[in-house]
């Protein structure tokens, strides 16, 4: 890919032996090298089967994967960067070149703000997770400082609501909770949203049950398994996720 020599190339090692500095890359060449490296890494981090797996779990169509919010959530679950995920989608013929350019024009910071990752709640460098029915029983590796939006559809017109089955883990702080209807029609389905921030290390479960508040039994249950650790400096996000999962003895969800 015409990259400049890496630190382990023979030429650089020979220069180091004579206390000479390795050549530096700057400007557009550096930017291009970063893009190429990102795309190359995506070949290993984002094989087609992994994209298909998460798309099927969440019911994401090919059209959904042209939306930056969906691509960002896919990237989080695959442990890859947003940019690498965009390139992988094109490489696997899920999007075309024009869509790739449109997606790359959008910065992850803008996407986070759209899903509720406001500056007052968390730093923009942290991730903004949106969890729904497709993440049921999934083992999710979260970093301290990340925000979590739980987004669940409910049949409020029939009296069924998503209710927290038990308090959230102590490492999470609940910041907000809201209900919005999908239409003005009487009895229309609604969405329950709960907004959290990961403030400390820890692991635990975030469980909900779909039930009428006055009834004992639920008609459905959902739980998200969370592993929250501080970011490991010097490691890529993908390696941090794998390391956290190995420590907790969990598999990628």
For the regions a protein language model found, what residue spans apply to each?
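Conserved binding/catalytic microenvironments
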Residues: 1-106, 253
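Extracytoplasmic soluble-region selector
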Residues: 128-253
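A general structural signal for short secondary-structure boundary/capping elements
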Residues: 8, 16-22, 119-123, 196-198, ...
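Residue-identity detector for glutamine
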Residues: 20, 33, 56, 73, ...
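Pan-zinc metallopeptidase signature
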Residues: 62-167, 236-238, 250-253
């Amino acid at each position: 890919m015409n990259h400049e020599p890496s630190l382990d190339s023979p030429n650089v090692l020979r220069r180091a032996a004579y206390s000479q500095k390795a050549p530096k890359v700057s400007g557009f060449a550096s930017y291009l090298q970063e893009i190429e490296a990102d795309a190359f890494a995506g070949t290993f981090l984002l094989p087609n089967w992994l994209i298909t797996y998460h798309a099927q779990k969440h019911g994401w169509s090919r059209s959904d994967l042209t939306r930056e919010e969906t691509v960002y959530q896919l990237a989080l679950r695959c442990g890859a960067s947003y940019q690498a995920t965009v390139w992988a989608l094109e490489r696997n013929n899920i999007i075309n070149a024009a869509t790739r350019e449109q997606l790359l024009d959008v910065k992850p910071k803008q996407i986070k703000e759209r899903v509720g990752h406001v500056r007052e709640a968390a730093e923009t460098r942290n991730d903004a997770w949106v969890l729904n029915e497709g993440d049921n029983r999934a083992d999710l590796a979260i970093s301290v400082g990340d925000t979590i939006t739980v987004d669940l559809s409910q049949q409020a017109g029939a009296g069924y609501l998503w209710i927290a089955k038990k308090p959230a883990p102590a490492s999470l702080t609940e910041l907000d909770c809201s209900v919005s209807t999908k239409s003005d029609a009487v009895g229309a389905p609604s969405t329950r949203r709960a907004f959290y921030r990961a403030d400390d290390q820890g692991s635990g479960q975030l469980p909900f049950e779909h039930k009428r508040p006055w009834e004992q039994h639920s008609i459905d249950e959902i739980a998200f398994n969370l592993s929250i650790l501080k970011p490991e400096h010097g490691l890529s996000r993908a390696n941090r996720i794998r390391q956290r999962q190995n420590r907790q003895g969990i598999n990628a969800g």
